Amino acid sequence: MILTLWYIFCWVTIIASIFLLVLEAVWSTLRRLAVNSTTATHEIARLGKHHPLGRVHGNAVVAGGSMAGLATAVVCSKFFERVIVIEPDSMNEHKRTRVAQAEQIHGLQAVALQVLRGIIPGFDSRLYKHGGRVLESNGQLQLGPTNISFKPGSLPDTLFISRLSLEKLLREYVRSIPTIEIVQGSVTRITPDVTRQRIECVTVQAKGCSSETLEFDAAMFADCTGPATIGLRLLEKTQNAGWGPYPKTSYDPKISYATALIPVPGRLKDILPIFTRHLDEYSTFSKLGYVKSIVPHPEQDDRIVCMVRSDEDHLMCGVGGWNLSLEARPRSFGDYIQQVDSIWQNASDGKSAEGDASRIAVMDTLRAIEVALGEDGIIPEFKYCKMGSCYKIDYTSAPKPSNFVTIGDSFLRVNPTFGQGISKALVDVATLNGVILDTTLVPSSSTGMPGWGLPATFSNEMFARQIPRVMHMWDSTKGSDYGRRGTELVEGETPDIGEFGRNYWRRVIQVANKDKNAAADIIRSLQLIAPPLDLLRPSLFIRGMWYGTKAP
């Protein structure tokens, strides 16, 4: 009897092993396809290259001069004779009046560093000049009650810098390119050509010293205006062109947050508790990236907290979340510290900090900084930001100009608390670069202009490559938001959408807590350099479902 059971066990084990090997082989094949279709990884090596046939004749007109627009202008300068950037704000001002989250905490994924290195020569030295750093992409994450830890050196590098400083870096580089012209103003109209297949010219209402109306011929028009979505409005209101309408799907997670730039006195840098207590997570101030990121489960708390060293001698300390009341805004740094302690305890299922050396050290570090700021008479100011709805625009459902593209939030906006906005725009930029390189330019006889032009299929090719690379961010963040109280759903949808993903994510976290290699694989996907399919690797999926029986 025992021998029979042993034979059965052996055969079951062999069959299960073969089945898993087959699944892994199928998954590996699908993954190779997914790397190309759902990430911009294969585009990175081609950044900075020129089209073999030469430059496209005419202007690439870029509406919007923020992060997406500036990066788009850099890429277009390699392919077009001239680039015109239209931006309502003055490029001489450091502040950004039209970007709500300009002074808030920003997360930058590893893909952002890779793209920026590809489009800007000597990017790292420029980054250091502006107070930024390159470090491992360790977010010091606690998801629910689970801390995620990693083997040193197992994570990809990313950049640490404030949004304002990064934008200043990009502005300086854009201004150094002689073929890029920056016009302060707003695009007010687009004019189709006689075939109504493409945009022929763009009308601009200038601002500043000159308030004249300008017109620019457009070899390509890129909407990089973010939530203003100027391209949507201009295309749909262009009469007799037959463009649009384009369905816009939106939901509102009711996100708000507040951030303060906290100076760290020089006398404290080497003696902060997170450094002196010999913790694995922290080494020195010069190598400090994230201090802590805490994302409680929905039933624990609707607030999240993040602390990161941004530029030079400062920490950016933020708190935000879903459908928060006015009382949730920190009024002072002391109030912020109390909120961090409260959120941390809620995320830890009510457990105190006793016995958690890392948690105690972080809280003691914050309190030490608070005391020092009091001694120096410095009162940090928390700046509040309330975000609008998340949305996607379906430009594939109706006719559109063949030389029209849209980059970043002007096409797809996701919940900013996940920190994907800039990286998502840079994925679009890398995709645009690849599509132009792969495009067969048409001669003047096809466009009515001298030199080379874009083919009639260009816009469709861009959207076909762009959508699968960014739409998974919409799907995953939307599914997460639907698990939060107060989220206003897409009309006709229910909170059940995304429930499997939310439950599976908790189970995957359990695996990551026990397996540092799996944790690193998961983070690479979240850093947008590996496909989301990596979260469904058979060995990970099976373990996730097993650990799910114990998931909180």
Annotated model-derived regions:
Residues 64-67:
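Glycine-rich Rossmann-fold phosphate-binding loop(s) that bind the pyrophosphate
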Residues 6, 17-38, 434-552:
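C-terminal helical "tail/cap" subdomain of flavin- and related membrane-associated enzymes
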Residues 323-431, 435-461, 465:
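FAD/FMN-dependent oxidoreductases across multiple families
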Residues 19-24, 118, 122-218, 224-230:
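Feature captures the FAD/FMN-dependent oxidoreductase FAD-binding
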Residues 176-342:
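Predominantly flavin-linked oxidoreductase catalytic cores and closely associated redox partners
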